[in-house]
Amino acid sequence: MCDCHALDRRSLLRAGAGVATVGALATFAPAAAGAVRTQTFRGAFTSPDTPDWHYLPIKVPREVREIEVSYEFHPTDTGAGFSYNVVDIGIFDPSGHDLGNAKGFRGWSGGARRSFGISRTSATPGYLAGPITPGVWTIVLGPYAIVPPGTEWQVTVTLRFGEPGPGFEPAPAPTSVPGTGPGWYRGDLHLHTVHSDGKRTQPEMITAAREAGLDFIGSSDHSTSSASYTWGRHTPPDFLVINGEEVTTRSGHWLATGLPAGTWIDWRYRAGDDQLQRFTDRVRAAGGLAIAAHPFNPVPSIRWEFGYDYAGIDAIEVWNGPWTGDDQTAVEHWHSMLASGT
């Protein structure tokens, strides 16, 4: 193990609003089949106003069979409500990590898990299996919440060398299923599996939905499209799964619903960046709808900050999870919009 990348806040090089690059390019030397190479990177987030996204570039050589990444940080719960350190993580491949670059996206788990792996054959839920292309891969750290005195972090990258396994074979869910004729169909468009922060696997989600009397569900894992590649392995022929994503920005969440399998929508922007319309337009161009999720949730970074005129949004969610005061506020707001003809 090489621990040659100890970093602190002074080594964070600003690369634009809400973005920082963590240190210099880290390089792994080529190795023979069967070899394993590991490097560890350390740093710290010491301020609540640290940039939203920190990029750790890793140069991956040829003949790598699998990439494994693990990370650690200190939650430091203050005991004062939603007030503790949370650091998210994800990765992009050499196709790039610029805003909206779906070709480079290879997965995101937020703060839901502490490690992941990617190979040509398989990947941890939340991540995309596929070729381990040589070049610069970029690990993304997202300090979702930082409380004083902050937190140190550690990222460990392991490369396993060897022949690639067989290619991953996608199995998306059918885009339509036989109905029962005119009438009401019952479903839920806002659900999470183990592909983000949910507790249920895809088969468990289908079972729970059937037991609840649902005819369809919307797959809406946070910030990743990975579940859409495998729903077809678990979905009965008479049950509809609608692909989607909960686009989890730092200025509120919105559902991209009705997407073609494999479609990924970026979330690395805030209300002041003037990017929402760009990505809701992308959803509609793909045949989907953009829905403001839990718009009156009071939690920072979840609270809707894109404006209550809902410019660029097709619908709003008025009930999310157990009924609470913010659901009541959403219903009243929705009713006032209907009454005013908005």
List each model region and its residues.
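N-terminal signal peptide c-region/cleavage motif recognized by signal peptidases
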Residues: 29-30
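Noncatalytic modules at the cell exterior or secretory-pathway interfaces
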Residues: 65-67, 129-145
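Surface-exposed beta-strand/loop patches in noncatalytic accessory domains
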Residues: 36-48, 75-124
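Solvent-exposed, flexible loop/coil segments flanking beta-strands in beta-rich domains
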Residues: 33-77, 161, 176-178
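Short acidic/polar inter-strand loop motif in beta-rich domains
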Residues: 76-77, 144-149
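A metal-dependent hydrolase metal-coordination microenvironment
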Residues: 172-311, 317-340
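N-terminal secretory signal peptides
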Residues: 1-8, 20-24
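Edge beta-strands of jelly-roll/beta-sandwich modules across compartments, strongly enriched
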Residues: 147-158
